UniProtKB/Swiss-Prot annotation:
Record-linked HAMAP family: MatK
Record-linked Pfam families: Intron_maturas2, MatK_N
Main location: plastid
Protein's name according to its UniProt entry: Maturase K
Taxonomic source organism: Astragalus sinicus (Chinese milk vetch)
Free-text function comment from the UniProt entry: Usually encoded in the trnK tRNA gene intron. Probably assists in splicing its own and other chloroplast group II introns.
Length: 508
């Protein structure tokens, strides 16, 4: 997005009203393609001709066709015959959808950058982007709380809801007409899919555009939640996030106050809770409080009414779970967390009398969920459902170096991500499964048994990197503490360079 800021900084004041002409600019599609290359997720269109890859010639041909209005006329019965957006030739549709995401992100990226500069957190923004930056906050705040609500944000059933939310921010009618054109064309092509699965299929075919629309849906409901939170509390509210000032928010806020004054007049008076914390990642959020569970039930009913009445999204009964932190754990970002009581006895002596004082302190215990990870490893064919390592037969055609490098990369990523666990035993078991799966894969490639392969190759020299890798990383971080590296193995280490979670971590 840095390139987009260079291109559009000169016209910054008018971009919000004139997004439609940007779809006809070649550099927009170049930005979309370079972004995919940087993320290493650009998919060559399987099932199409070799010419259906990104090139400047294809983009110019696409822009020329977009100027011809007859190519944009679509009917539900004519999708297969349409040369521009047909089911069999939808490569242009894919390119334009990627360009849509770039164009609609531009004004909000500029607003977000200016908001960071005004808040003077631009220097620490890179650290705040890390997934692990959430856990120090949890360790500091959650031991003092008693109850937690585990909330799963429901998806909008219809894509039109996402478009309507975006219309409150950007006022460009032609742009949204064309956006609806693509969304309805997608629904017509997948009419055999149920509405609930349709949005899931759309998220896979157009991930960038879908994530942008979905994030706006989440930001919309969070902005209303934050408004009511500040309205109900007389204390000063501090937020760890940067929220934009919405165009349509104040008119909607008056309507909300009117509605909640009728239906929740007695509820709002009970919402004064100075110790309430809200954390969200992707489609899951955590709401924690120190007060009685009655307040948490009030917030639960508030969320359900907000989703169903304001966003027309049906919320299932099991969407929100209220738990007591001292008795139950909650799942977030691949970890199981709960508040554990630490008891210690202190001996105190006064003159000739000796007293034993028991001190009870609370500590947030963050552990690795071994069973979900074993399920993920079994799904990826590294082990069976019981956790017994098996050979990765798909990789048997690769060279020995590539096989070992792949296993080491996965082991390194998991070890890097789960190094914040307070108990390392589960992490060592995961590394053992990957190590033995690597050995079995190499033995399968050479058509020999595991014992014969290790005897011929030498197990210590072949896979010693599985054991030395973590110590090498710690020696780089703490170069003067090499003699006490084993001390850090039992402690938590949170890394501020983790921007994405591994696929094996996403168990849900």
């Amino acid at each position: 997005m840095k390139e987009s800021q260079v291109f559009l900084e000169r016209d910054r004041s008018r971009q919000q009203d004139f997004l439609y002409p940007l779809i006809f600019r070649e550099y927009v599609y170049g930005l979309a393609y370079s972004h995919d290359l940087n993320r290493s997720t650009f998919v060559e269109n399987v099932g199409y001709d070799n010419d259906n890859k990104y090139s400047l010639l294809i983009v110019k041909r696409l822009i020329t066709r977009m100027y011809q209005q007859n190519h944009l006329i679509i009917s539900a019965n004519d999708s297969n015959k349409n040369p521009f957006l047909g089911y069999n030739k939808n490569f242009y549709s894919k390119i334009i959808s990627e360009g849509f995401a770039i164009v609609v992100e531009i004004p909000f990226f500029l607003q977000f950058s200016s908001s960071l500069e005004e808040a003077e957190i631009i220097k620490s923004y890179k650290n705040l982007r890390s997934i692990h930056s959430i856990f120090p906050f949890l360790e500091d705040k959650f031991p003092h709380l008693n109850y937690v609500s585990d909330i799963r944000i429901p998806y909008p059933i219809h894509l039109e809801i996402l478009v309507q939310i975006l219309r409150y921010w950007v006022k460009d009618a032609p742009f949204f007409h064309l956006l609806r054109l693509f969304l309805y064309n997608f629904c017509n092509r997948n009419s055999w899919i149920t509405p609930k699965k349709s949005i899931s299929t759309f998220s896979k075919s157009n991930p960038r555009l879908f994530l942008f629309l979905y994030n706006f849906y989440v930001c919309e409901y969070e902005s209303i939640f934050l408004f009511l939170r500040k309205k109900s509390s007389h204390l000063r509210f501090k937020s760890f996030s940067v929220f934009f000032e919405r165009i349509f928010f104040y008119a909607k806020r008056e309507h909300l106050v009117e509605v909640f004054a009728k239906d929740f007049s007695s509820t709002l008076t009970l919402f004064k809770d100075p110790l309430i914390h809200y954390v969200r990642y992707q489609g899951k959020s955590i709401l924690a409080s120190k007060n009685a569970p009655l307040l948490m039930n009030k917030w639960k009913h508030y969320f359900i009414h907000l989703w169903e009445c304001f966003f027309d999204v049906w919320s299932q009964p099991g969407t929100i779970h209220i738990k007591q932190l001292s008795e139950h754990s909650f799942y977030l970002l691949g970890y199981f967390s709960n508040v554990r009581l630490n008891r210690s006895v202190v001996r105190s002596q006064m003159l000739q009398n000796t007293f034993l004082i028991e001190i009870v302190s609370k500590k947030l215990d963050i552990i690795v969920p071994i069973i979900p990870i074993i399920r993920s490893l079994a799904k990826a064919k590294f082990c069976n459902v019981l956790g017994h390592p098996i050979s990765k037969a798909v990789w048997a055609d690769s060279s020995d170096f590539d096989i070992i490098d792949r296993f080491l990369r996965i082991c390194r990523n998991l070890s890097h991500y789960y190094n914040g666990s307070s108990k390392k035993k589960s992490l060592y078991r995961i590394k053992y499964i990957l190590r033995l799966s690597c050995i079995k894969t190499l033995a399968c490639k050479h058509k020999s048994t595991v014992r014969a392969f290790l005897k011929r190759s030498g197990s210590e020299e072949l896979l010693e990197e599985f054991f030395t890798e973590e110590e090498e990383i710690l020696s780089l971080i703490f170069p003067r503490a090499s003699a006490t590296l084993h001390k850090f193995n039992g402690n938590r280490i949170w890394y501020l360079d983790i921007l994405l979670s591994n696929d094996l971590v996403n168990h849900e």
